[in-house]
From Swiss-Prot:
EC identifiers of the protein: 2.5.1.145
Protein name: Phosphatidylglycerol--prolipoprotein diacylglyceryl transferase
Lineage start: Bacteria, Bacillati, Bacillota, Bacilli, Lactobacillales
Any single GO CC term annotated in Swiss-Prot or TrEMBL for this entry: plasma membrane
Keywords attached to this entry: Cell membrane, Membrane, Transferase, Transmembrane, Transmembrane helix
Source species of the chain: Streptococcus thermophilus (strain ATCC BAA-491 / LMD-9)
Length: 263
C-alpha cells in the first residue's frame, strides 16, 4: 500500500507550496491561454483577458471561500481562525463561478464587450480548469463520496488516497474531473465541426452540461449541506441547467426570427 500524498508539494524555508494551489493555478493559466486564443474570433482584444483575470481571480477565490464558509458555518463559527486557511482546502466552485460571472458582466459592460461573446470564449477554459482543479480535492482528500468496500477498478495511487477514515470512498472528484474533460472535448468538437454555432451556444452548453454532471455527482457526496431534500449544490445545479436551457431557447427563437426577416 502506498502512503497518502503530502498536500504540500514543495517547501522553501517558511513558504509551503500546496498541490491544491498548483492545480488551481495550472487550470487558471490554461484557461487564460485558451481565452486569449479564442478572443480574436469575437473581436475581443486578447489583452482584455489578462486584465479581466487579474481582477476576477482574487474576487472569485474570495467568493468561492465565502460560499464554502457560509454553508459550513457550524464548523467555522467554532473555529474562526480556520476561515482564512484556504491552503487546507475548502472552496466551493459555485461560489467562484457566481463571483466571477458578476465581475465578467461588469468588465464586459465597462469595455463595451458583448457579455455572451465574453462568456463563449471563457467557457472552454473554465471547464478544463475545473477538470484540473478537482485533482486538488484528490490530494486534500475532500469532496469524496460514500464508503465502499473496494475500488479495484482504479489505479493504486487513487485507491490509497481515497482510503479515508478507515474506508474506501467513492472518488467523486475523479468523476467530475472526467465529466468536465469530456465536456471540454465536446466544445472543441462543436467548434471544429459545427461552423453554425451562434452567440451564446457554447455558454448554454457549458451551463447545461456542467449543471447535469454536478447534479448527479453531488448526490454521491457526503459532505454537502442538505436543503429541502436535496443538497444545496444540487439546487444551484438545477438553476444553472434552467438558465442554460432558457438561454438556448431564446437564442434559437431569435435565430428563427432573423431567418424569417431575411426571407
Amino acid at each position: 500500500m502506498l502512503a497518502t500524498i503530502d498536500p504540500i508539494a514543495l517547501r522553501l524555508g517558511p513558504i509551503s507550496i500546496h498541490w491544491y494551489a498548483i492545480c488551481i493555478v495550472s487550470g487558471l493559466l490554461l484557461a487564460v491561454y485558451l481565452a486569449q486564443r479564442l478572443a480574436p474570433e469575437k473581436g475581443i482584444n486578447p489583452e482584455h483577458i489578462l486584465d479581466f483575470i487579474l481582477l476576477a481571480f482574487p474576487i472569485a477565490i474570495v467568493g468561492a471561500r465565502l460560499y464554502y464558509v457560509i454553508f459550513q458555518w457550524s464548523y467555522y463559527s467554532q473555529n474562526p481562525s480556520e476561515i482564512f486557511a484556504i491552503w487546507n482546502g475548502g472552496i466551493a466552485i459555485y461560489g467562484g463561478l457566481i463571483a466571477g460571472a458578476a465581475v465578467l458582466y461588469w468588465f464586459a459592460k465597462r469595455h463595451a464587450i458583448a457579455v455572451l461573446d465574453f462568456l463563449d470564449i471563457a467557457a472552454p477554459g473554465v471547464m478544463i480548469a475545473q477538470s484540473i482543479g478537482r485533482w486538488g480535492n484528490f490530494v486534500n482528500q475532500e469532496a469524496y463520496g460514500k464508503a465502499v468496500s473496494q475500488l479495484n477498478y482504479l489505479p493504486e495511487i487513487i485507491r490509497q488516497q481515497m482510503f479515508i477514515d478507515g474506508s474506501y470512498r467513492v472518488p467523486t472528484f475523479l468523476y467530475e474531473s472526467l465529466w468536465n474533460l469530456v465536456g471540454f472535448s465536446i466544445i472543441l468538437g462543436l467548434r471544429y465541426f459545427n461552423k453554425g454555432l451562434r452567440q451564446g451556444d457554447v455558454t448554454s452548453f457549458y451551463l447545461i452540461w456542467y449543471g447535469l454532471g454536478r447534479f448527479v455527482i453531488e448526490g454521491m457526496r457526503t459532505d454537502s449541506l442538505m436543503f429541502v431534500g436535496l443538497r444545496v449544490s444540487q439546487w444551484v445545479s438545477i438553476s444553472i441547467i434552467i438558465l442554460g436551457a432558457v438561454l438556448l431557447y431564446f437564442r434559437k427563437q431569435r435565430q428563427k426570427a432573423d431567418y424569417k426577416m431575411k426571407n
